[in-house]
Amino acid sequence: MYKRQADTIGRAVAEKYHLHFMDREAIAASAKEAGCYDEYEEFYSERPVNSLLYSIVMETEEDNVLHDTPGRALTFIDRLPLEDGCEGYVIQGRCANFAFQGRDDVVSVFLTANDAFCVDTVADTHGVSVRKAKTVVRETNDNRKTYHKYYTGQEWGQAENYDLCLNVAKLGVDGVIAMIDSFIQNRK
Protein backbone atom coordinates (compact mmCIF):
# COMPACT_ATOMS: atom_id res chain seq x y z
CA MET A 1 0.00 0.00 0.00
CA TYR A 2 1.29 3.41 -0.98
CA LYS A 3 2.40 5.70 1.86
CA ARG A 4 2.60 3.24 4.67
CA GLN A 5 5.81 4.69 6.16
CA ALA A 6 8.17 2.24 4.38
CA ASP A 7 10.94 4.85 4.07
CA THR A 8 10.89 5.67 7.78
CA ILE A 9 10.73 2.02 8.80
CA GLY A 10 13.36 0.87 6.31
CA ARG A 11 15.80 3.59 7.34
CA ALA A 12 15.31 2.82 11.05
CA VAL A 13 15.90 -0.91 10.55
CA ALA A 14 18.95 -0.17 8.38
CA GLU A 15 20.39 2.10 11.05
CA LYS A 16 19.75 -0.41 13.85
CA TYR A 17 21.47 -3.26 11.99
CA HIS A 18 24.24 -1.19 10.34
CA LEU A 19 22.85 -1.69 6.83
CA HIS A 20 22.63 0.64 3.84
CA PHE A 21 19.06 1.70 2.96
CA MET A 22 18.31 1.44 -0.75
CA ASP A 23 15.13 2.96 -2.14
CA ARG A 24 14.26 3.47 -5.82
CA GLU A 25 16.64 6.41 -6.20
CA ALA A 26 19.59 4.71 -4.46
CA ILE A 27 19.10 1.51 -6.47
CA ALA A 28 18.92 3.44 -9.75
CA ALA A 29 22.03 5.48 -8.89
CA SER A 30 23.96 2.34 -7.89
CA ALA A 31 22.81 0.54 -11.05
CA LYS A 32 24.12 3.45 -13.14
CA GLU A 33 27.47 3.27 -11.35
CA ALA A 34 27.57 -0.51 -11.89
CA GLY A 35 26.80 -0.02 -15.60
CA CYS A 36 23.59 -2.05 -15.70
CA TYR A 37 20.95 0.70 -15.52
CA ASP A 38 20.30 0.99 -19.26
CA GLU A 39 19.59 -2.72 -19.64
CA TYR A 40 16.86 -2.65 -16.97
CA GLU A 41 15.77 1.00 -17.02
CA GLU A 42 12.03 0.25 -16.97
CA PHE A 43 12.49 -2.10 -14.03
CA TYR A 44 14.54 0.38 -11.98
CA SER A 45 12.22 3.30 -12.69
CA GLU A 46 9.05 1.33 -11.82
CA ARG A 47 7.28 2.71 -14.86
CA PRO A 48 3.66 1.67 -15.20
CA VAL A 49 3.40 -1.43 -17.34
CA ASN A 50 1.65 -1.07 -20.69
CA SER A 51 -1.63 -2.98 -20.25
CA LEU A 52 -1.62 -4.42 -23.80
CA LEU A 53 1.96 -5.64 -23.42
CA TYR A 54 1.09 -6.99 -19.97
CA SER A 55 -1.82 -9.03 -21.38
CA ILE A 56 0.34 -10.49 -24.13
CA VAL A 57 3.16 -11.38 -21.75
CA MET A 58 0.84 -12.97 -19.19
CA GLU A 59 -0.70 -15.21 -21.88
CA THR A 60 2.70 -16.76 -22.65
CA GLU A 61 4.37 -19.56 -20.74
CA GLU A 62 4.33 -19.45 -16.96
CA ASP A 63 8.12 -19.33 -16.53
CA ASN A 64 8.34 -16.07 -18.39
CA VAL A 65 11.77 -14.56 -19.02
CA LEU A 66 10.57 -11.33 -17.39
CA HIS A 67 10.39 -13.20 -14.09
CA ASP A 68 14.20 -13.39 -14.20
CA THR A 69 14.49 -9.60 -14.42
CA PRO A 70 14.43 -8.77 -10.69
CA GLY A 71 17.19 -11.25 -9.92
CA ARG A 72 19.35 -10.12 -12.85
CA ALA A 73 18.66 -6.43 -12.27
CA LEU A 74 19.53 -6.59 -8.57
CA THR A 75 22.55 -8.94 -8.71
CA PHE A 76 24.90 -5.97 -8.73
CA ILE A 77 23.88 -5.24 -5.11
CA ASP A 78 25.80 -8.30 -3.89
CA ARG A 79 28.90 -6.86 -5.56
CA LEU A 80 28.64 -3.37 -4.06
CA PRO A 81 31.39 -2.49 -1.62
CA LEU A 82 30.19 -2.25 1.97
CA GLU A 83 31.34 1.01 3.51
CA ASP A 84 31.02 2.82 6.82
CA GLY A 85 30.86 -0.40 8.82
CA CYS A 86 27.66 -1.49 7.07
CA GLU A 87 27.03 -5.21 6.81
CA GLY A 88 24.43 -5.36 4.03
CA TYR A 89 21.31 -3.67 2.71
CA VAL A 90 17.67 -2.90 3.34
CA ILE A 91 16.09 -2.81 -0.11
CA GLN A 92 12.74 -1.08 -0.50
CA GLY A 93 10.59 -2.38 -3.34
CA ARG A 94 11.94 -3.46 -6.73
CA CYS A 95 10.57 -7.01 -6.21
CA ALA A 96 13.45 -7.66 -3.81
CA ASN A 97 11.39 -10.32 -2.01
CA PHE A 98 11.36 -12.27 -5.27
CA ALA A 99 14.91 -11.47 -6.37
CA PHE A 100 16.44 -12.65 -3.09
CA GLN A 101 13.98 -15.40 -2.15
CA GLY A 102 15.35 -18.52 -0.54
CA ARG A 103 18.41 -16.84 0.94
CA ASP A 104 19.14 -17.37 4.63
CA ASP A 105 20.61 -13.87 4.96
CA VAL A 106 17.41 -12.14 3.79
CA VAL A 107 14.20 -11.16 5.59
CA SER A 108 11.39 -10.02 3.31
CA VAL A 109 8.73 -7.74 4.77
CA PHE A 110 5.54 -6.40 3.24
CA LEU A 111 3.99 -3.37 4.91
CA THR A 112 0.29 -2.77 4.57
CA ALA A 113 -2.26 -0.32 5.94
CA ASN A 114 -5.90 0.45 5.31
CA ASP A 115 -6.78 2.95 2.60
CA ALA A 116 -7.81 5.64 5.09
CA PHE A 117 -4.37 5.57 6.73
CA CYS A 118 -2.60 5.77 3.37
CA VAL A 119 -4.87 8.55 2.09
CA ASP A 120 -4.42 10.60 5.27
CA THR A 121 -0.65 10.14 5.09
CA VAL A 122 -0.54 11.28 1.44
CA ALA A 123 -2.81 14.26 2.12
CA ASP A 124 -0.72 15.34 5.14
CA THR A 125 2.69 14.67 3.57
CA HIS A 126 1.98 16.31 0.21
CA GLY A 127 -0.57 18.91 1.26
CA VAL A 128 -3.22 17.70 -1.19
CA SER A 129 -6.95 17.19 -0.81
CA VAL A 130 -8.32 13.88 0.42
CA ARG A 131 -9.91 13.39 -3.00
CA LYS A 132 -6.56 13.84 -4.77
CA ALA A 133 -4.83 11.63 -2.17
CA LYS A 134 -7.36 8.83 -2.81
CA THR A 135 -6.60 8.96 -6.52
CA VAL A 136 -2.83 8.96 -5.94
CA VAL A 137 -3.02 6.01 -3.51
CA ARG A 138 -5.29 3.97 -5.80
CA GLU A 139 -3.22 4.62 -8.95
CA THR A 140 0.11 3.98 -7.21
CA ASN A 141 -1.12 0.74 -5.66
CA ASP A 142 -2.57 -0.43 -9.00
CA ASN A 143 0.74 0.33 -10.75
CA ARG A 144 2.77 -1.50 -8.10
CA LYS A 145 0.44 -4.50 -8.19
CA THR A 146 0.78 -4.73 -11.98
CA TYR A 147 4.56 -4.10 -11.87
CA HIS A 148 5.11 -6.86 -9.30
CA LYS A 149 2.92 -9.35 -11.17
CA TYR A 150 4.58 -8.49 -14.50
CA TYR A 151 8.12 -9.06 -13.23
CA THR A 152 7.51 -11.93 -10.80
CA GLY A 153 4.27 -13.70 -11.69
CA GLN A 154 3.31 -13.29 -8.03
CA GLU A 155 0.53 -11.30 -6.44
CA TRP A 156 1.89 -8.18 -4.72
CA GLY A 157 1.29 -8.31 -0.97
CA GLN A 158 0.33 -12.00 -0.74
CA ALA A 159 1.59 -13.28 2.62
CA GLU A 160 3.16 -16.47 1.25
CA ASN A 161 5.61 -14.36 -0.77
CA TYR A 162 7.12 -12.66 2.31
CA ASP A 163 8.58 -13.63 5.66
CA LEU A 164 6.49 -10.97 7.43
CA CYS A 165 3.41 -8.91 6.55
CA LEU A 166 2.77 -6.07 8.99
CA ASN A 167 -0.04 -3.52 9.25
CA VAL A 168 1.43 -0.08 9.92
CA ALA A 169 -1.98 1.44 10.67
CA LYS A 170 -2.50 -1.02 13.53
CA LEU A 171 1.07 -1.31 14.86
CA GLY A 172 2.43 2.17 14.18
CA VAL A 173 5.98 2.78 12.97
CA ASP A 174 7.60 1.84 16.30
CA GLY A 175 5.49 -1.32 16.60
CA VAL A 176 6.45 -2.44 13.09
CA ILE A 177 10.14 -1.83 13.79
CA ALA A 178 9.83 -3.83 17.04
CA MET A 179 8.12 -6.72 15.20
CA ILE A 180 10.83 -6.80 12.52
CA ASP A 181 13.50 -6.73 15.22
CA SER A 182 11.79 -9.55 17.13
CA PHE A 183 11.53 -11.63 13.96
CA ILE A 184 15.22 -11.14 13.17
CA GLN A 185 16.24 -12.05 16.73
CA ASN A 186 14.02 -15.14 16.92
CA ARG A 187 14.17 -16.69 13.46
CA LYS A 188 15.87 -20.03 13.06
What are these regions, as identified by a protein language model?
Residues 1-5:
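Conserved small/polar residues in nucleotide/adenosyl-binding loops
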Residues 7-19:
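A conserved segment at the C-terminal end of the G1
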Residues 19-32:
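Short beta-strand-centered segment that lines the nucleotide-binding/catalytic pocket of NTP-utilizing
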Residues 31-87:
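ATP-dependent small-molecule kinase phosphotransfer cores
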Residues 49-56, 67, 130-174:
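Small-molecule kinase domains that catalyze NTP-dependent phosphoryl transfer to phosphate-bearing small molecules
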Residues 102-140:
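Conserved phosphate-donor/acceptor-positioning beta-strand/loop module used by diverse small-molecule
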